[in-house]
């Protein structure tokens, strides 16, 4: 699982708690980074994390809290919180992707490229299911493995094992003019599809992310529409409250 906005992710964690017990170590590191970004001291962060873990101790063995706290502090205090990161894609990179004859392959490679550059061109891990979801590719696992093998054979993708875990790196020439600035990672593949099918896409009136045009009325992406609906509900509720308050006076 790739976390593109650690700030937003940490705020959701604080509000709703752990969602996956297999990610508690990584979640704690992000929480430490978030509280460090918020200006808290190391002792304050330690206390906050301890309280947080106690609140959700039903999700794991509570005897390991001290170990988890030490590990999270050791990692989280060393690195900055990652959010509002922009990935630039060049025309040369798009040309290389477009030289592949199968659209599904191109979609997978584009998403891999974005992740690789988001990771500052370091090796990265991602499950096939997550990669398929981000690339919006629907196929059997055997077919998807064939896609990855073909990208490897084309020289674009390098897969290797490090500490018994599979990692990826890319081999794509970066030169040329920048043609895409990716700022929103809710729908990565829409950036690429909007370039090859420009007549089918418009841009969200709020955040600017490309969105597939399904009707003449559509102006917002899903995330911005949800936020706009929330603001409208708040406004309506406020007016209703004020109206009834006047009646009772």
Where in the sequence are the language-model features?
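Short helix->loop/beta-hairpin flanking segments within DNA-binding domains
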Residues: 99-133, 210
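Short, cationic low-complexity segments
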Residues: 188-193, 210
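BZIP DNA-binding basic region
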Residues: 196-249
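Short, exposed beta-strand "edge-strand" segments with a Pro/Gly-rich flavor and a Y/T-containing core
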Residues: 81-86, 124, 213-220
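Modules that initiate DNA replication and primer synthesis
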Residues: 1-101, 122, 130-140, 144-190
């Amino acid at each position: 699982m790739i976390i593109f906005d650690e700030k937003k992710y940490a705020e959701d964690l604080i509000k709703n708690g752990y969602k996956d017990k297999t990610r508690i170590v990584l979640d704690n590191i992000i929480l430490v980074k978030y509280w460090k970004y918020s200006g808290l001291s190391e002792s304050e962060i330690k206390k906050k994390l301890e309280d947080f873990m106690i609140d959700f101790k039903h999700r794991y063995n509570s005897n390991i809290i001290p170990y988890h706290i030490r590990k999270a502090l050791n990692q989280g205090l060393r690195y900055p919180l990652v959010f509002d990161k922009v990935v630039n894609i060049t025309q040369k990179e798009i040309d290389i992707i477009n030289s592949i004859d199968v659209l599904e392959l191109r979609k997978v490679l584009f998403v891999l490229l974005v992740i690789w550059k988001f990771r500052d061109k370091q090796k990265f891990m991602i499950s096939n299911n997550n990669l398929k979801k981000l690339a919006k590719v629907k196929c059997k696992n055997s077919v998807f493995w064939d896609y990855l093998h073909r990208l490897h054979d084309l020289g674009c993708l390098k897969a290797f094992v490090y500490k018994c875990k599979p990692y990826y790196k890319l081999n794509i020439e970066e030169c040329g003019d920048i043609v895409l600035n990716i700022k929103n990672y809710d729908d990565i593949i829409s950036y690429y599809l909007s370039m090859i099918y420009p007549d089918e896409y418009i841009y969200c009136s709020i955040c600017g992310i490309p969105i597939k045009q399904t009707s003449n009325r559509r102006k917002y992406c899903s995330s911005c529409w949800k936020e706009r609906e929330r603001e409208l509900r708040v406004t309506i509720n406020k007016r209703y409250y004020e109206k009834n308050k006047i009646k009772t006076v």
